[in-house]
A protein has these predicted regions:
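C-terminal catalytic histidine-bearing segment of alpha/beta-hydrolase fold enzymes
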Residues: 251, 314-369
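Primarily recognizes the serine-hydrolase "nucleophile elbow" in alpha/beta-hydrolase
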Residues: 177-246, 275-277
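Mobile cap/lid helix-loop segments that gate and shape the active-site cleft of serine hydrolases
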Residues: 218-285, 306, 310-314, 320-327
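Gly/Ser-rich "nucleophile elbow"/oxyanion-hole loop immediately N-terminal to the catalytic nucleophile
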Residues: 95, 147-200, 216
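Short beta-strand/loop motif that positions the catalytic acidic residue
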Residues: 289, 296-298
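N-terminal cap/lid segment of alpha/beta-hydrolase-fold proteins
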Residues: 41-95
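Cap/lid segment of the alpha/beta-hydrolase catalytic domain
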Residues: 101, 106-174, 228-235
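The conserved beta1-alpha1 loop
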Residues: 88-89, 97-105, 298
Length: 370
């Protein structure tokens, strides 16, 4: 009986890998074409960065805390969208240092990343966090994800021909490119040693923003690697939809559906994050990282990022890194029995990954801009 169960489990694992490999081989456009398409999709006129520093003060253990904002874009109503930034850095200046950007999840804010900013600053790096669109200081006084859900609902209801925002990931991706413009101007930052680490929503923003921007030398998308297409096709969309359930319920009502279902998700996602079910899905985007150091951190039981879909993305990344002769620069860690959570062991893995790949500058400078 025991041998039979073991054989069955092994067979299921084998066929799961075969299915992932088959889906990973799904023909996506070449990486350069995907990169160009995403840049074009999100493009908008740049405005001067206009950094405005609001605070520089001593922090714990001889560290320095900075708070500032930068300009990201001029919106359709003429208002300048500004990105709030929190930085923790070593007190000593002189030799340019590595910098790590940390991104929070849905309903969070930059303050939730302070422990990471302090951790990397103690390692001699500069830590930076931002508030995503409609989060933190950008939520208009709302708490959690309320303003974010309202913004996505409003974006869903925009009529054809009217200005269309993309608060569901894409607009924050643009902000991150502007943050990279800013850090590239700081004399205390080594532009060859910039990393991006994101959790949940922030992880998705990481594999979108950093995939197409070579200025990000090292990336860690945590509890975020998945396949949106697989989740929808296999009726496993619920975890992702529930992170912004109010927007999905509004879309269901507008579409005349009694409840949120696959059709609602498909129509909503195609409008507010166009391309996420096709060329901009995670299995396609991870190919663009090769051969930069990429650490993927996932949970075996994560309902937001079903493992079966995540394996498709894993396989796509493994193939791309193999073809680039850089398999040693890709690491995938799946925590057994863990849902949508980063374990203490995985946190140490992230810190060690940053130290490993940011200690020594690369010889080739990054491309300017995206």
């Amino acid at each position: 009986m025991f041998k039979s169960l073991c054989f069955s489990a092994a067979l299921l694992l084998f066929w799961g890998r075969v299915a992932a490999a088959d889906d990973a081989s799904r023909p996506y456009p070449p990486p350069a074409e995907v990169r160009a398409k995403l840049l074009a999709q999100l493009d908008r006129p740049r405005v001067p960065l206009d950094p405005q520093v609001t605070l520089v003060e001593p922090g714990e253990a001889g560290l320095i805390v900075e708070r500032l904002t930068i300009a990201s874009e001029r919106k359709a109503d003429g208002q300048i969208e500004r990105v709030p930034i929190l930085i923790v850095r070593p007190k000593e200046t002189g030799t340019p240092r590595p910098l790590v950007i940390f991104l929070h999840g849905t309903g969070g804010n930059k303050e939730s990343q302070v422990h990471w900013l302090v951790r990397v600053a103690r390692l001699g790096m500069i830590g930076l966090a931002i508030d995503a669109r409609y989060h933190g200081q950008r939520a208009g006084g709302a708490t959690g994800a309320a303003a974010y859900v309202d913004a996505i609902t409003a974006a869903w209801r925009v009529k054809p021909g009217q200005p269309q925002e993309h608060p569901f990931y894409f607009d924050t991706v643009w902000d991150l490119w502007r943050v990279l413009d800013y850090v590239g101007q700081r004399p205390d930052v080594d532009p060859r040693r910039v990393a991006m680490v994101g959790f949940s929503m922030g992880g998705i923003q990481t594999w979108l923003a950093a995939a197409v921007d070579q200025r990000v030398a090292v990336a860690v998308p945590a509890i975020s690697v998945q396949s949106f297409r697989w989740s929808l096709d296999h009726d496993r969309w619920q975890g992702r939809a529930n992170t912004i359930s109010g927007a999905h319920r509004a879309a269901a009502e507008d579409l005349g559906e009694p409840e949120v279902n696959q059709r609602v998700c498909r129509v909503l996602w195609n409008k507010v994050i166009p391309g996420i079910l096709d060329d901009f899905d995670c299995p396609s985007m991870l190919r663009l990282f090769a051969d930069r150091p990429l650490l993927i951190v996932s949970g075996e039981l994560d309902p937001n990022c079903p493992l079966e879909g995540a394996r498709i993305a894993f396989a796509a990344a493994e193939q791309a890194y193999k073809e680039a002769g850089a398999s040693d620069r890709l690491q995938i860690d799946v925590a057994e029995g863990v849902a949508h959570h980063v374990t203490g062991k995985q946190e140490k893995l992230i810190a060690d990954w940053l130290v490993r790949w940011l200690q020594t500058p690369e010889k080739t400078p990054p491309e300017k801009g995206q």
